[in-house]
């Protein structure tokens, strides 16, 4: 879990991990030099639960660096992702890991609901396909980072590309290029929080960052990039209906 000035929401995010029906977890939080009470809040949880560990980037470096610090210190075979303002449903880990074991798969994700900044439901649920591969994902970035679990004993070790935005998209594509598809559970296992920064300008920036992933990370030619981007834009609109 990366954190930066997350004092308003991080307690709820941490509590959603503590409340999991699956108990064999470790929560690795890397703080990116927060200026609020984020660290103090995390430290209070650590006193009560030694499965929670806190690291620091040392200097403000962005979410990719924070996530990678946690990845470097993770000891488990399953890697799950959660941002400091989002929430897991209590049976998320148990349900998803059992699904992965039964299907013998390396990369899974799930449907998730969207909540308002105050935690109340918006009524919007993002429903996911049962399976998606590299070319499908280029056109439909449907995978919510907060829902992903990866078996790194199957995929091999990985880090998030150190880019300013869309690091998760770039990582999923990297893993897919290793020959793995992502398998979706229709169960709604997480809640994505819409915060005040989730505005039109941020969405426009996210769209530009997706284009950068096509051209600068994946090195896709302009024509195919345009085709993929049209698919991305259409699916982004559908996702918000």
Question: Residue spans of the language-model regions?
Answer:
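Short, well-formed alpha-helical segments that are part of the catalytic scaffolds
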Residues: 6-19
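Conserved nucleotide-sugar donor-binding catalytic segment
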Residues: 72, 124-205, 209, 213
């Amino acid at each position: 879990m990366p954190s930066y000035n997350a004092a308003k929401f991080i307690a709820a995010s941490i509590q959603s991990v503590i409340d999991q029906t699956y108990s064999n977890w470790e929560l690795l939080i890397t703080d990116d030099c927060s200026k609020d009470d984020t660290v103090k809040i995390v430290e209070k949880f650590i006193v009560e639960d030694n499965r929670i560990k806190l690291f620091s980037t040392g200097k403000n470096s962005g979410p990719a660096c924070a996530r990678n610090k946690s990845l470097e210190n993770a000891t488990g075979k399953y890697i799950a992702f959660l941002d400091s303002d989002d929430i897991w449903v209590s049976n998320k880990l148990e349900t998803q890991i059992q699904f992965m074991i039964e299907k013998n798969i390396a990369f899974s994700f799930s449907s998730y609901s969207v909540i308002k900044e105050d935690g109340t439901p918006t009524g919007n649920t993002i429903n996911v396909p049962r399976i998606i591969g590299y070319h499908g994902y280029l056109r439909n970035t449907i995978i919510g980072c907060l829902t992903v679990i990866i078996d790194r004993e199957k995929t091999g070790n990985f880090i998030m590309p150190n880019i300013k935005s869309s690091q998760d998209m770039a990582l999923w594509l990297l893993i897919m290029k290793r020959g793995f598809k992502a398998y979706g559970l229709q169960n709604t296992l997480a809640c994505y929080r819409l915060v005040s920064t989730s505005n039109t300008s941020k969405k426009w920036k996210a769209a530009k960052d997706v284009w950068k992933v096509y051209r600068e990370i994946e090195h896709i030619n302009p024509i195919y990039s345009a085709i993929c981007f049209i698919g991305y834009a259409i699916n982004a609109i559908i996702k918000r209906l």
